[in-house]
């Protein structure tokens, strides 16, 4: 169930301060964050945010289409290596 519109988007305050500081100074360095639950807001457009996936920080360049999504959606936490091949099918 989506978040109520009357509540507004959730964004951690420490991340919001980092974003405002980066926009104000025009700094293009990636912003490191562990806050995967924060929603992408319009002031983040054009910034690179390094989102933690449990092992490393994944750089995410924020575009206009990402507004309203959460940062964690763009930093996958699991690696899929494929299913084991069926040995019987290979012999044929």
Swiss-Prot record:
NCBIfam families noted in UniProt: rpsS_bact (TIGR01050)
Molecular function terms from GO: rRNA binding; structural constituent of ribosome
The scientific name of the source species is Vibrio vulnificus (strain YJ016)
- What name does UniProt use for this protein? Small ribosomal subunit protein uS19
One GO process term, biological-process aspect: translation
InterPro entries associated with the record:
Ribosomal_uS19 (IPR002222), Ribosomal_uS19_bac-type (IPR005732), Ribosomal_uS19_CS (IPR020934), Ribosomal_uS19_SF (IPR023575)
Give the encoding gene's name.
rpsS
One cellular component term (GO) for this entry is: small ribosomal subunit
* Primary role: Protein S19 forms a complex with S13 that binds strongly to the 16S ribosomal RNA.
Q: List UniProt keywords, sorted A-Z.
A: Ribonucleoprotein, Ribosomal protein, RNA-binding, rRNA-binding
Gene3D superfamilies annotated for this entry? Answer: 30s Ribosomal Protein S19, Chain A
User: What's the family?
Assistant: Belongs to the universal ribosomal protein uS19 family.
